[in-house]
Swiss-Prot record:
Keywords: Chloroplast, Membrane, Phosphoprotein, Photosynthesis, Photosystem II, Plastid, Thylakoid, Transmembrane, Transmembrane helix. This is Photosystem II reaction center protein H. Disulfide bonds: none annotated. One of its GO terms (biological process) is protein stabilization.
């Protein structure tokens, strides 16, 4: 058996910290799956916004569509 305890020594527990106390509720739902779509739609919206952000950055870097009428000297 892989989980068998060989000796009965005292197991040390981790120290409590403020960050741990704050993050504890986030871990309480570990392994549970909410029914339905949950936050999938919200994630899709943020992914789309991030894609738009990346396209804008790329266009600025390439001095393309967004900066056609603006002289850039760098």
């Amino acid at each position: 058996m892989a989980t068998k305890t060989i000796d009965n020594s005292i197991k040390l527990k981790g120290r409590r910290s403020a960050v741990g106390d704050i993050l504890k509720p986030l871990n309480s739902e570990y392994g549970k799956v909410a029914p339905g779509w949950g936050t999938t739609v919200l994630m899709g919206v943020f992914m789309a916004l991030f894609a738009v952000f990346l396209v804008i950055i790329l266009e600025i870097y390439n001095s393309s569509v967004l900066l056609d009428g603006i002289p850039v000297s760098w």
